[in-house]
Amino acid sequence: MNPAFSVIAFTVLAGAAQGLVVALACAALGGVAAGRGFLLAALGLALVMLVAGLGASFLHLGRPERAWRAAAMWRTSWLSREVIVLPAFTALVALWWLLAWRGGAAPTLLAVAALALAALLWLCTAQIYACLRFIQEWAHPLTLVNYTLVGLASGCVLACALAASFGERALLAAAAPWALTLTFAAWAGRTAALLRNAGLKPKSTAQSATGIRAERVVQKSMGMSAGAFNTREFFHHASALAVQRVRWALHGLGFALPAALMITAAQSGSTHPAWWWLAVASQVPGLLAERWLFFAQARHPQNLYYQTVS
């Protein structure tokens, strides 16, 4: 598939915002106290990321003014369900921020609702792709696992960076081990998906498409002399070397370097925020690379006709 940066930005930003809110909700339910300034900054950042992600997703629409119609098919469409859950989650985060601004503590019900809506939003987003059975790379439970784990890991690392900056040592001590654990878990899940995808074989072949029973069928032409929607939207047009470099960025910047920085901070006993912000700075381009590869690796069956030419 051709990765659209608007969708990549939306899923990375929204996923990290969900993870950040989940970390705050778990801290609230676990009785870990957090200062008003920290909560305002963390919830405000989550709101900005959610709104920015939503704005980025509009750039992918051919007719943005018709976006409201996307919610009409909620009974059968995971995209419609996402369109409903995302504003609900954003509104809940805004309500929490307002309560923090007024100096009130978050009710237990609000924290539980935040956890539930975050989980539901990950489900809706992942199922948009996992429900497409004809794209083998996506049609697997690992799609949901990876969307959830990557969001939790990035959000938890961001929560630790903010906690270190605001001197919230109790919250940092509670969240730091989870940030490292979730980063390794997300790395393992993404590696498992990459290994699985590398071994997939197309279910359709030139022989099955044409009905020719010859052992070897060679396609000589696409049947067209110019580009079209099919050749633009369903193939990334990047070289094998470029894809390999993106894969290196995924592993190195997205997971290995942030994990190394977190381990170094833990072993040195340092609570300086620089370690955590360096981890965030490394993780952002790494996760953009991860999400680009997620889309680029998806092989649409139509590419057997439009892309395989001798």
Predicted regions and their residues:
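Short helix-terminus and kink motifs of transmembrane alpha helices
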Residues: 61, 65, 189, 295-299
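Membrane-helix interface motif
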Residues: 19, 23-29, 62-64, 158-168
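Membrane helical hairpin/interfacial module
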Residues: 36-92
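N-terminal signal-anchor module of multipass membrane proteins
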Residues: 1-52, 284, 296-297, 308
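Long, contiguous internal "core" modules enriched in hydrophobic/ aromatic residues
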Residues: 5, 11-13, 32, 76-77, ...
